[in-house]
From Swiss-Prot:
Active site: C188 (acyl-thioester intermediate)
HAMAP family: LipB
Main function: Catalyzes the transfer of endogenously produced octanoic acid from octanoyl-acyl-carrier-protein onto the lipoyl domains of lipoate-dependent enzymes. Lipoyl-ACP can also act as a substrate although octanoyl-ACP is likely to be the physiological substrate.
BPL/LPL catalytic domain location: 42-226
Organism listed in the record: Aeromonas hydrophila subsp. hydrophila (strain ATCC 7966 / DSM 30187 / BCRC 13018 / CCUG 14551 / JCM 1027 / KCTC 2358 / NCIMB 9240 / NCTC 8049)
InterPro entries linked: aa-tRNA-synth_II/BPL/LPL (IPR045864), BPL_LPL_catalytic (IPR004143), Octanoyltransferase (IPR000544), Octanoyltransferase_CS (IPR020605)
CDD domains in UniProt: LipB
Binding site for substrate: R81, G82, G83, Q84, V85, T86, Y87, H88, S157, L158, G159, G170, L171, A172
Key words of the record: Acyltransferase, Cytoplasm, Transferase
Chief place of localization: cytoplasm
Family: Belongs to the LipB family.
Any one of the GO CC terms: cytoplasm
Record gene name: lipB
The protein's name: Octanoyltransferase
Molecular-function GO terms, alphabetical: lipoyl(octanoyl) transferase activity
Length: 234
C-alpha cells in the first residue's frame, strides 16, 4: 500500500494527518502501519487512518485457537496487536491511531481511555448511553434485546501495539454491518458475548457519519492543533 508522505514539522506543534483509505484488505494496511511506525522520526506528524476492511478475522497476541469456532471461508490473520480474536468487515469503522505517545506525554492506559471516551462521547450525541469497563477494553451498552440474552452488548473493540514509543492499530466500531460473522467466534475471547452496532441503536447509520464525529472527538481529546484530511487512492 503506497501512501503520500507528509511534510514533517517541529514536534512542538501537535499536528494530525487523517487518511481516508476507503475499503481495503487487512494485510496491506497492517504492513503499511508497521512500515510507517518503523520509519517515523521525532518530527513525524501523527496520523489517523480511517478504513473499512474486507471480511477478516484477526487474532491478537493473546488470541487462542479455541475462540475461532467456525471461521469457514473468512480468512484468519495472526496480528501483532493486543487482545484476542475479532471480526472486521464492510460497514464497520476501523480507526488506526498512529501516535507518538512519548511526544504526546500519554501513557498507554491514557491513550486507551482517550479511545474509549471518544467513542462514548460520539455515541452520546445520538442519545446512546455507552460505557467502558476497566477489566475488558472496549465500549459497551446495556443489551436491549431481551432478558434471556446477555445483559450487555459490545459496540467497539480496541487493540494497540506500541513500538519505538509510538502506537499503531486502534479501534473498530460496529456501525451498519452484517453481524453474523461474530457468531462464528468468541469475540475478544468471551464465549457468547453479545455484539451490536450503532445503526441498531438509533445512532450513526453509515461509516462516513460515524467517522466524522469520532475523529473530531479523539483529535480534541489528544490535543491536536492542526488537522489535515487526505483521501488515498486504493
Amino acid at each position: 500500500m503506497s501512501l503520500q508522505t507528509p511534510t514533517e514539522s517541529p514536534s512542538s506543534a501537535p499536528r494530525l494527518l487523517v487518511r481516508q483509505l476507503g475499503r481495503r484488505p487487512y494485510q496491506p494496511v497492517w504492513d503499511a502501519m508497521k512500515a510507517f511506525t518503523d520509519s517515523r522520526t521525532p518530527d513525524t506528524p501523527d496520523e489517523f487512518w480511517v478504513v473499512e476492511h474486507d471480511p477478516v478475522y484477526t487474532q491478537g497476541q493473546a488470541g487462542k485457537a479455541e475462540h475461532l469456532l467456525a471461521p469457514g471461508d473468512i480468512p484468519v490473520v495472526q496480528s501483532d496487536r493486543g487482545g484476542q480474536v475479532t471480526y472486521h468487515g464492510p460497514g464497520q469503522l476501523v480507526l488506526y491511531v498512529l501516535v507518538d505517545v512519548r511526544r504526546s506525554k500519554l501513557t498507554v492506559r491514557e491513550l486507551v481511555t482517550c479511545l474509549e471516551t471518544a467513542i462514548i462521547n460520539t455515541l452520546a450525541k445520538s442519545g446512546i448511553e455507552a460505557y467502558a469497563k476497566p477489566d475488558a477494553p472496549g465500549v459497551y451498552v446495556k443489551n436491549q434485546l431481551g432478558a434471556a440474552l446477555q445483559t450487555e452488548a459490545k459496540l467497539a473493540s480496541l487493540g494497540l501495539r506500541i513500538r519505538k514509543g509510538c502506537s499503531f492499530h486502534g479501534l473498530a466500531l460496529n456501525v451498519n454491518m452484517d453481524m453474523t460473522p461474530f457468531l462464528r467466534i468468541n469475540p475478544c475471547g468471551y464465549a457468547g458475548m453479545a455484539m451490536t452496532q450503532t445503526s441498531a441503536l438509533g445512532g450513526p447509520q453509515s461509516v462516513a457519519e460515524a467517522q466524522a464525529m469520532l475523529v473530531a472527538e479523539l483529535a480534541s481529546l489528544i490535543g491536536y492543533e492542526t488537522i489535515t484530511n487526505t483521501e488515498e487512492a486504493a
